[in-house]
Amino acid sequence: MRILASALGLVLMTGCPSTSVYRTADPIEPGSYQVGGATSIGGISDEAQETRSATGQTELMLRYGVIENLDLGLKLFVPGVEVNATYRVHRGNLWSWALLPSLSWVRSKESSATVDAINAFASLGGVASRPLGDKWHIGFGVYSGYGLYWPETGGRGHGVWVGSFALADYQLRDRWHLTPELSMYKVVSGQVPVTGGAMQTGIALRVDL
């Protein structure tokens, strides 16, 4: 419990975005909804401070199918919000491909390690997925993002990161999905969200309404 509390406390203090995906290249059906929740644990490496810290995140998510190849999503996570989309660009006999754009906003609180600040992030990813039998799907993807940091004390920071992820989606009964995922990213320019990188593993439970 102490480890989990410390991890959640770190996420609350820092302005890290949610980099999880928890979905394949196939959007949900037009006119339908999907809700779910997820939890993850991982680590952040801060090269400037030469430190490594544990982290964790809890998420709630909602998706709506707009048209055959597009759905829109809303994600609430500690301590921010994200809007995203799944746009399928190819549907093959085995593999499907989709683009994954997102915008997120995070508010970090003042503490001994951080200041009161607003963080904004934009990301574009891609995922390729395919079925494995009747109940399993697997997916692999990459993404890149840009972040801005506005502290209350003045000034501005920014950063560019690249990352990758792998996931498996298991259909429980007719409407339920269990989705484990492994993801990682590296900041290649600037210092937002951290001068370094992070890795996390998590699991999501989603239901089609």
What residue spans do the PLM features occupy?
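Generic structural signal for beta-strand residues in well-ordered domains
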Residues: G9, I28, R63-G65, D169
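Glycine- and aromatic-enriched membrane insertion/assembly motifs of diderm outer-membrane
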Residues: T51-V106
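A generic local structural motif
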Residues: V21-Y22, E59, F165
